[in-house]
Amino acid sequence: MGSSDRGIRLRTAARTNTGQVRENNEDHIHLWAEDDFALAIVADGMGGAAAGEEASQIAVDSVRAALEAPQEHGDRDFLNAMSIEYIAQQLCDAIRTANLRIVERASSNPELRGMGTTVTMVFVRGTEAIFTHVGDSRAYLINGRDRFITQITADHSFVEALVAAGHITHEQAEEHPMRNVLYRALGQSDDIDVDVYETRLRPGDRLLLCSDGLTRHVKPHEIADVVLSDEEPELASEALIDLANSRGGEDNVSVIIILVEATDPERYREQERAASIDDTLVLPESPIIEALKLERSAQDDPEDTLKLDEIFNLRRASLPRDGQASESPTAAHPAHSGEGRDRLPNG
């Protein structure tokens, strides 16, 4: 099924910026888009400039190799024929491959000790979107019609775990000395768990992927306000980076925006009816985190390491946070059900 058959097209933009403080950009991003297909990746490296840059590049290259080859050879039928489950498996396998490459690279070079990266990505096919995620970069769904924003991914950070357990508030988390510490990232160990999410998109929806250089300075409702104020993803992405930099730009900042448009509304409705959609958000299959581990300091200093073992059990499917629903794996998708998201004022 080609893009004309679905009645959908995607408009996209991708930007990354060093920020106002850092000398190097350890973020790597990638965006491939054609008609109603897109693959977007944000990876935020850590462990020092050279190590972080290399780790995030490895993550991006591994995923590109997994899914772009068929498209580069014009094999759209292959991409259309792939099941969502197969796509998810390919993306997860690519992340695990990248993780092993990073671990091996660090073990072979003492100067790269502590290297690692986050990775957040989405593969879009028409109105289908499949996300895979490790770390604290984020994916958001912004509903243009009803003006709300939903955080799709869960941060794998120490402070978010403390918030979820009721030990600290969101406000305290923003000032916590361990706010930059992750309990899961590529490069920590040979094995890695990957979160997988699936949702359906509608015309007018925007997907936004970003590194924490954006969310450190810009609140979710502000992100949505900027994105919805401009129909051009390129201008919206530029405005978000400018806003983050105007507020200090303490970290590298990366933004990818994907806007869903209906080129043939009637054809789109026919395809959606035929697909018998149920707007379901699929949360990670293994919701219990037994232990939290990381070798990453608040300053990304590989010599200043932290290991957090067996702090508490955490049910990942019930992480409440700004702009993110806290429903069970069978709950209606918050993006279209009216629950659990930041709503913007009209106008």
Q: For each predicted feature, which ranges?
A:
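PP2C/PPM-type serine/threonine phosphatase catalytic domain
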Residues: 1-347
